[in-house]
């Protein structure tokens, strides 16, 4: 080591900082809503427009239950595609709730594509939708879907009777006619600037947890409207749904996700695919709010989801929901039980809430802010090495193979999550790395954020790129 306590070959040992800066948000883009009856091919059309599989597609009416927005690009034009649940004017129960979602999409979009199954023809529901859309004053385009051949063009022609102008004959499944439809639609949308804002955009929050734990209810309580379908059916929310919500004087981007099933491999159809998408939502988030049912014992599934969030390296807030269902004389006991069950992650932010009544929901914002501040934290190299020197002097690493490893140099390679690299003369046992993590937290905080400690062993003098252990 040099006199200032750093390894003399520091330039050879340091890792390059990963580029974790968020991509700048695009300028506000016009919204194109895709609406129609259940199972007419809306999500397939959305996927065709995007050129990738995003919307859940399955041959079962009602698979898409929430409004879902995706950024799209066509011939240099940026816009937002909004997928919706099936639109049924007189739907009951869950279908009625989805119909309300579609109605909101009609009101908030800049243009609407009404998708009709050309092989079925215009139904009473299709004609009712057309009348409502015409009254909206928005540009409306009629997509006659499932026209897979020239012979089927006649089916599309019968839809002139709906009064929406020319039916655009398409096959969302095979791509037929979709390009011409988009060219026509984009002529009615305002131009979108290609320049990208220098701002970072709202912090991203994923809501995760078992089915029916209260994710949608919490989102609605925070947003103050029925943004996400809430229904007393486990697994009601199928697609991740982004909502921009102002809380505590700032805007947050919430992603409401489908509950992870007991075992993803055992889920079938759209449930399996939505579970995979939930994993993607965790990866896309910066802070994850894990909802746990306080009225029930902690389950293996809860712990498995928590492990997945930590492995993804996201800031964490544990929200024990349905706290209002816990007897007051049991709450202190339950708090202690939770501390014992989660002893390995005492660093996680925790709040006890009721999404239904709104109890303590306001505590979520400070918890998320604390977790994100820890997640963003960087410790300068000088103070970090001074700290490691003091810790090692008081508690050296255990002897391994007759030799005691020395820590030569420490650096924080990245934030988000804070990741530290220790350059050593030998392998550090897992127990000692956990000890260092505890001491790091005692000194520097990191409340609500996982931290990672990687070790690079200097096998012999002069080795410039030692292997990671």
Swiss-Prot record:
GTP 2 binds at residues 209-216, 256-260, 321-324. GO terms for biological process: ribosome biogenesis. Residues 377-459 form the KH-like domain. PROSITE patterns: G_ENGA. Keywords: GTP-binding, Nucleotide-binding, Repeat, Ribosome biogenesis. InterPro entries: AAA+_ATPase (IPR003593), G_ENGA (IPR031166), GTP-bd (IPR006073), GTPase_Der (IPR016484), KH_dom-like (IPR032859), KH_dom-like_a/b (IPR015946), P-loop_NTPase (IPR027417), Small_GTP-bd (IPR005225). Pfam families: KH_dom-like, MMR_HSR1. It comes from the Bacteria. Residues 30-193, 203-376 form the EngA-type G domain. One of its GO terms (molecular function) is ATP hydrolysis activity. GTP 1 binds at residues 36-43, 83-87, 145-148. GTPase that plays an essential role in the late steps of ribosome biogenesis. Belongs to the TRAFAC class TrmE-Era-EngA-EngB-Septin-like GTPase superfamily. EngA (Der) GTPase family. Associates with the 50S ribosomal subunit. HAMAP family: GTPase_Der. This is GTPase Der. The gene is der.
